[in-house]
Regions:
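Helix-turn-helix repeat elements of alpha-solenoid scaffolds
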Residues: 10-19, 47-48, 64-65, 76-94, ...
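Eukaryotic alpha-helical solenoid repeat scaffolds
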Residues: 86-127, 146, 152-281
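Structural signature of alpha-solenoid helical repeat scaffolds
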Residues: 27, 55, 59, 101-102, ...
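Short, charge-rich amphipathic alpha-helical segments embedded
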Residues: 15-51, 135-144, 148
């Protein structure tokens, strides 16, 4: 019963009441298994009521570790997944505000404000934080943050160009973004790609770099979104997507001779993709 009093106070974000209920619980049941977790949550709530002072670079990682490794597990264990995530959001928001002045550091990217805003559930603030990073569209971490924020704020259609660029730039980061989003369509399309496309002569190229080109073969209706991806490093996967977009245009226009020549170029670029394309014809 006293544990429930602590939990109720925590959910109300009443730090004083939580502290009093926790003290009563400790007095009556000093070996209660939830004491350590409840103490962690009460302390976190008390600290969140203090002024949110900017983080110095040396403070950033310890502050993130405290919230990520101690407070968050305690909240999920004691409050449950739904209430726990909702309870944690203001704490992530406070940490994001404190990290706002920290520059992007590729070696410590997790302590930038953008991923903290994502964890707080503020997609617009996450986008704004990413836009403050120079050349963010050429760096895997901020490109992934922007793709996630854009998808959550505006839907998957708005994020397709960013996801394409991420596939070309850093396949593992794309996989991480897809896992974080939990979008059924995105997960299904990635799974289908893994199940159906043989890398063929291009085993040295990261497999997910070919996903955008395969995606256009499998889902040609996505062409208006995929073609908005910005030019990258002119890699073979990027050239293949552009070529497939050209092929779809030639088909619509009935330009047979040019279509045959473009198909030959596709076959030379990636035989397995060419075979997948021809199967759909």
């Amino acid at each position: 019963m006293l544990r429930n009093d602590v939990l109720d106070a925590l959910l109300r974000r009443d730090a004083a009441a939580a502290g009093q209920a926790l003290q009563a619980l400790r007095g009556l049941a000093p070996t209660h298994p939830a004491l350590a977790a409840l103490d962690t949550l009460t302390e976190a709530l008390q600290r969140d009521g203090e002024p949110a002072l900017p983080l110095a670079p040396a403070q950033a990682l310890p502050a993130l570790a405290q919230l990520e490794q101690r407070v968050a597990p305690a909240a999920l264990a004691q409050l449950g997944a739904a209430d726990g995530h909702a309870w944690l959001a203001p704490l992530w928001r406070t940490l994001a505000l404190r990290a706002a002045a920290l520059p992007f550091n590729p070696q410590q990217s997790d302590v930038h404000a953008a991923p903290l805003w994502l964890r707080a559930g503020d997609w617009q603030a996450a986008e704004a934080a990413v836009q403050g990073i120079a050349s963010w569209r050429r760096i895997p971490a901020p490109l992934g943050w922007m793709a996630e924020a854009r998808s959550r704020r505006l839907g998957l259609d708005a994020a397709w160009p960013l996801l394409v660029e991420l596939a070309w730039l850093a396949g593992p980061r794309l996989a991480a973004v897809a896992k974080a989003l939990g979008d059924p369509l995105l997960a299904r399309l990635l799974r289908r790609f893994e199940d159906h496309l043989d890398p063929g002569l291009h085993a040295e190229t990261p497999a997910l770099a070919w996903w955008p080109a395969w995606l256009l073969v499998d889902q040609p209706a996505l062409l208006p979104h995929l073609r908005l991806a910005e030019a990258g490093q002119d890699s073979a996967p990027e050239r293949t997507l552009r070529l497939l977009a050209e092929l779809l245009g030639l088909e619509r226009e009935g330009r047979h001779a040019e279509l045959m020549a473009a198909r030959k170029r596709l076959r030379d670029l990636h035989p397995a993709l060419y075979a997948a394309y021809m199967r759909s014809r």
